Design a protein with these regions (language model features):
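A short, surface-exposed helix-loop junction/capping segment
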Residues: 1-5
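Short hydrophobic helices that act as membrane-entry/anchoring signals
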Residues: 6-25, 104, 108
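Soluble catalytic domains of membrane acyltransferases
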Residues: 26-187
Length: 187
């Protein structure tokens, strides 16, 4: 599979999963709708397209939901899934965000596909060439499992969708699953 060793990914998901489970499932009472649409998806070439409200809670919630789905627990998150998580999950993330500290670096081991943003760096608008290797890495992720993308490329609401997403869809023809995240700004 693409990315880090599966054993390492499973360990990171297990370690990060326990404290985040409490926050997501107990304190904030994550509400999941539309889970029935995910049950019969193939194990590879599935592309989740989502809005982005926080730096990490969105992705962590996806991991909890997908691992829970693997075990067949339905809408109620049961942390036993952390003992054998779905490890073929990948997510597109800004390289600068994932290199900014120990916790982001740890999370990146769980399946980050790092992208060098062409329009923004360290909070400042920039103009640089598009990172063409990012599309290749997303393709490898799709061949190995499920990929989560936040095509707005920012946590700002109503930002335009970046063009790379359409290129990935056209070249890979994945199953595309649109996702709406709501409420993390209040969490």
């Amino acid at each position: 599979p693409f990315g880090n060793w599966m054993v390492l990914k499973r360990m990171v998901i297990f370690i990060a999963g326990w404290p985040t489970y409490w926050r997501i499932a107990i304190a904030n009472k994550l509400k999941i709708e539309g889970l029935e649409h995910l049950k019969d998806l193939p194990n590879t070439n599935v592309f989740f397209i989502s809005n982005h409200q926080t730096y990490f809670a969105d992705v962590i919630s996806f991991y909890h939901i997908f691992c829970n789905l693997k075990w067949g627990f339905g809408k109620k998150l049961m942390p036993i899934y952390l003992f054998s998580p779905r490890a073929t999950i990948y997510y597109v993330a800004a390289k600068e965000t994932m290199k900014s500290g120990l916790i982001p670096k740890l999370f990146s081991l769980a399946g980050a596909i790092l992208v060098e943003r062409s329009w923004r760096a360290e909070g400042v608008n920039v103009k640089r060439e598009v990172d063409t290797s990012a599309g290749d890495n997303v393709t490898m992720g799709l061949k190995s499992g499920w990929v989560i993308s936040f095509p707005q490329g920012t946590t700002s609401p109503y930002a335009p969708v970046r063009k790379g997403t359409s290129h990935i869809i056209l070249s890979n023809r994945p199953v595309v699953v649109p996702v709406v995240i709501n409420g993390f700004r209040r969490a």
